[in-house]
């Protein structure tokens, strides 16, 4: 049975107060450096309240920007006056949000008394409950490690997959940017995959007999809750500081990796605000402290969306890392493995050359710490839905991502250092 528009509207009122009626996402293609400079100037116009989903970087690479209804005409007229090509990618953002909310409510009704649906988006409480279920159902393999609490005092719970002993480890996190919901969902599916297939799948069994895996499905719990209850487009943490009315820090600009350099903003109201100091965000510091204290983490992998990319250092500079050849070879093989399932193509390379220069990122920090195998995935899609990927794409996204992850993990297993 389909939900009535009234129920969907009520759900939106309760769970997502900010609406985006009439907002459009434009795909813009700058032809040269001058047009990129123009788009960067446009991005700085705070009164337009533009939300760049894919920022300007190099000529002829697409830029995606959500434009509020009130600014649409001004932005389009400006682009046309500058000779910058654009097209409408999403006609009305609110239409996709309404569909997403309807699916969530329908799933919540359907899940009562039934098994957890990994092909749906869930609240933080539902995710944490399923993590507890995985621990309870697999006591000899899965345990829960609390590495700290968020700014709003929500637990940061990591799932540890281990067969015992003091093994080297792989770190995997998701959801550092709140609105990238397919990443949290993919991470939870991955956790269930590892737990359910150990002992029957030779690849997973071999991996866990050699390595531990630490998996943090929701790296930014405060932001994730806020994206579900107040503003679906929220990206940052929810930290507050005296002297600023703007809330939050971009947690993937807050790491001690050329902190405050190119690609990060000093403006507290920016979605790319790097924060007052490295590791100022408790969510970031909790991970830093845990990984440093563990001392044997050999791979650091983070899941983002969207754009279908598999990247490695560096982001804060455009120089190749010392291990470029090996990292590129591993990433290329992982992308090929991923593609075999559904034909999904990924672009591979260092962050700086694949997207843009960005300082203070997690995998740069990990690599500079000595964790050689540091990778960032940008999951589906390439922009048709952007951050609003329909729930029906969660399972195929998770399934193909696992093949890429497994390729990297097997390389880490076979190349100890």
UniProtKB/Swiss-Prot annotation:
Localisation: Secreted
UniProt GO cellular component terms: extracellular region
Cofactor(s) the protein requires to work: Zn(2+)
A molecular function GO annotation: zinc ion binding
Comment on bound cofactor: Binds 1 zinc ion per subunit.
Chief location category: secreted
Protein name (record): Carboxypeptidase A2
